[in-house]
Every structure is written in structure tokens, then in C-alpha cells.
Amino acid sequence: MIQMTLIQIDNYGPWTVTPRPRNESDLQILQAELYADLERQFANKKGLVFFTRFDNLLAVTNGIDEEDHLRIQRSIRNRYPITISMGVGAAETPHEAQKLATIALQKEGGAQSSKRKEILAIDSLAPADENNLVQAAHIDINSVTETLTDIESAFDTNFMVNKAQHYLMTKLIKKGALLFFIGGDNFMAPCNGLSEKEIEDILVEINDEIGIGLKAGIGVGRNMEDAAYMADLGLEEIRDHDNGMWTWVIEKEY
């Protein structure tokens, strides 16, 4: 079972234009600093935050309980000009878990409601036992430096990376998995419920459809930090074998 947390800036849209529109650079700085701050705090509890839309962030939070979430909310309130609300949900697939988290928060009021502030809406928490594991795939583009970065313009390379992301997201969401861009040519996919063969089939399909070669290290652990690190190690194994396989699975031993 995987646990997801939705983090939403309270009443953010109206705040950005009150009493007058704020400088765009200031808003970008606020969003970037808030993301880094949240990443640091959730990482201290072995979670992982994805910036998603910056005013709405998603995190994999297995092992992070109600009090942990409340402490993070208080910390943000004390140091920022905004507050955050959170929804938490746990399910067999990441897509279903984030859906439960979203619905729980939506029931407490709209994102731009002036009456909703610093809500923690918990639908469900994943039990903290050895049977509740997180599975994540770290996916990247094969030889992106040689095939894109060093020969195409920066924006055209970015376009191709976004194209790969779009195809991956479209196919993974149908299987109940999620996908997030994590920099460079890298993507992280919380993917509880998917087999190695299903992930490989998706990578093969994308290569056939748009000619972009991909590989995936797949990690399994009791929390997202461990799962992501195992996925990183799996990706290194593929690189060490000259990208000769599509996937490599590593499960953390405890």
C-alpha cells in the first residue's frame, strides 16, 4: 500500500494579486523556496515531494503520520507569508492514493477559498508494517547527451524530454501509476501494482512510437526514500551493461 499527500497553497491565486499583482520573479522564488523547504522536511522522514504545479505538490509519504504533517504545516506558517493545506490518502496504487488525498482536501473547501486555511484532511494512512512497500521506477532517456543535448538546441532538447514525459504519463496513468519530472532527462514513477514486464512493455511501446529509447531502474522499499534509491541503483546497473536491457529491479533488504 502506498501513501500520498497532496500539498496545496491556501488561497494562492487571490494572494498573488492582492492588493495588486506581485512581481512574477518574486512568485517564482517563493514557489521554488517552498518546494525545496517541503522536500527537505519530508525527506527527513524518508518521504519524497514532487513539485507538480508548484502551488499543488504531491508527495509519497509512507511512514509519515498525522503529527509529522501538522509539524510541517506549522513550520511553513511560521516562516512564509502563506499557509498550506494537505490531504492524505493510502491505496494499492499511487493514482488511487492521490485521488483519495485530493477528495479529502476538496471536501474541506476550494483551493481559493478564503475560509479554508491550514487544513489537514486525512482519508487514510498506510499501516507502518513490513508488508506495506513502496515501488518506484527511475526512468531516463538513453544517451541523451550524445543524441540531444550536444547536437540540438536547448529548447528543442527540452521539447523532446517533455514529449517523452507526456507519453510515459499517458501510458502509466492507465495502469494506476504516476510520473514526475525530476530534472535533466530523468523521471520518477511511483508504480505500486505494476510488474517489471508491464513497465518494460511501456518503454518498448514508446521507443516504437516516437523513437526515444528509455530505461528504468525499479526499486522497492518500506518508504519512498529507500524505493527511489534502489531504483537509482537499478538504473546504474543498466548503464554498467551499456543500456543492454530495459529494466532492472532491486528490493531493499532490511
From Swiss-Prot:
It catalyses: GTP + 3 H2O = 2-amino-5-formylamino-6-(5-phospho-D-ribosylamino)pyrimidin-4(3H)-one + 2 phosphate + 2 H(+). Signal peptide: none annotated. Its EC number is 3.5.4.29. It comes from the Archaea. GO terms for biological process: biosynthetic process. Pfam families: GCH_III. Keywords: GTP-binding, Hydrolase, Nucleotide-binding. One of its GO terms (molecular function) is GTP binding. Catalyzes the formation of 2-amino-5-formylamino-6-ribofuranosylamino-4(3H)-pyrimidinone ribonucleotide monophosphate and inorganic phosphate from GTP. Also has an independent pyrophosphate phosphohydrolase activity. NCBIfam families: PRK02240.1. Belongs to the archaeal-type GTP cyclohydrolase family. This is GTP cyclohydrolase III. It comes from Methanobrevibacter smithii (strain ATCC 35061 / DSM 861 / OCM 144 / PS). The gene is gch3.
